[in-house]
């Protein structure tokens, strides 16, 4: 196992996978640490980033959005305004804080679909089911995982089909588990490739724990920004562990990652200011088939 520690450096942009350990911080949540190898890495107390095709000079960083929003960092929510979803095979239900009927949630078999912006607190379990988010593309949704176990043999466990941004919050003191299947059954116009898949911006935060198994391809994949500011993660994936097409930004959390390809990846190389990985904090143990 290779272990490297850094005390000071400049943060760089990453065009694709995290393959060379480089940087420290220019802001964000906190200074963190990182190291990587194709076998394993254990890291603490430094911020890192890298580029497959070279590293960006400090003068070039202006094109990159390296900041975290207040809501990215704040995992709190108003419990009195939330909708509570109890997951159960064939019997999932939703209610308000005062136990009234809840709008914005539909149930079909083992699938639960959220259709309105707001905060949704999920608990319970689904076997061969999925939680969908399909809201207005200019609105936001917060999913609070409060002791959730979801498995889906032929698709993702959480699938954001439409939203401006979705926040997945890990409730304090809870352990949550998501496991997808090795083969997806998809309609012609569908494209999920991960246990948690979002077509739009996605943030993971909170202080709870999340175990993610990506048997099909990836564990977490966003087609826009993927941001993580807290939580404890045990991740296993056939291909990539954490994949944000436009960017991957992490400023906190503990990560135990085993994957067949890249642990941390961003792949948009066609737009200026996109396709970078920025690490501003966190504790990482990584075993990756590719160069992380």
Regions found by a protein language model. Name each.
Residues 2, 11-292:
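A composition-driven surface/loop motif
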């Amino acid at each position: 196992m290779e272990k490297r520690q850094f005390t000071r450096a400049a943060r760089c942009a990453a065009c694709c996978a995290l393959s060379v350990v480089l940087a420290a911080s220019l802001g964000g949540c906190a200074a963190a640490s990182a190291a990587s190898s194709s076998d394993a890495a254990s890291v603490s107390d430094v911020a890192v980033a890298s580029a497959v095709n070279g590293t960006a000079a400090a003068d070039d960083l202006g094109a990159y959005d390296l900041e975290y929003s207040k809501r990215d960092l704040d995992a709190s929510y108003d419990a009195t305004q939330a909708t509570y979803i109890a997951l159960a095979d064939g019997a999932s239900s939703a209610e308000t804080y005062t136990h009234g009927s809840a709008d914005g949630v539909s149930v079909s078999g083992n699938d639960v679909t959220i259709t309105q912006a707001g905060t949704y607190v999920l608990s319970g379990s689904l076997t061969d089911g999925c939680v969908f988010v399909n809201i207005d593309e200019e609105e936001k949704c917060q999913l609070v995982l409060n002791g959730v176990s979801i498995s889906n043999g032929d698709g993702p466990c959480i699938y954001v089909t439409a939203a401006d941004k979705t926040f997945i919050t890990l409730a304090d003191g809870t352990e949550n588990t998501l496991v997808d299947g090795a083969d997806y059954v998809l309609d012609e116009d569908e494209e999920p490739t991960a246990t948690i898949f979002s077509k739009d911006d996605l943030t993971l935060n909170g202080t709870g724990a999340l175990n993610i198994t990506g048997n099909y391809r990836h564990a977490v994949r966003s087609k826009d920004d993927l941001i993580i500011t807290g939580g404890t993660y045990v991740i296993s994936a056939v291909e990539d562990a954490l994949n944000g097409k436009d960017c991957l930004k992490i400023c906190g959390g503990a990560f135990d990652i085993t994957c067949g390809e890249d642990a941390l990846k961003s792949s948009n190389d066609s737009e200026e200011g996109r396709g970078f990985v920025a690490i501003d904090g966190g504790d990482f143990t990584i075993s990756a088939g590719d160069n992380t």
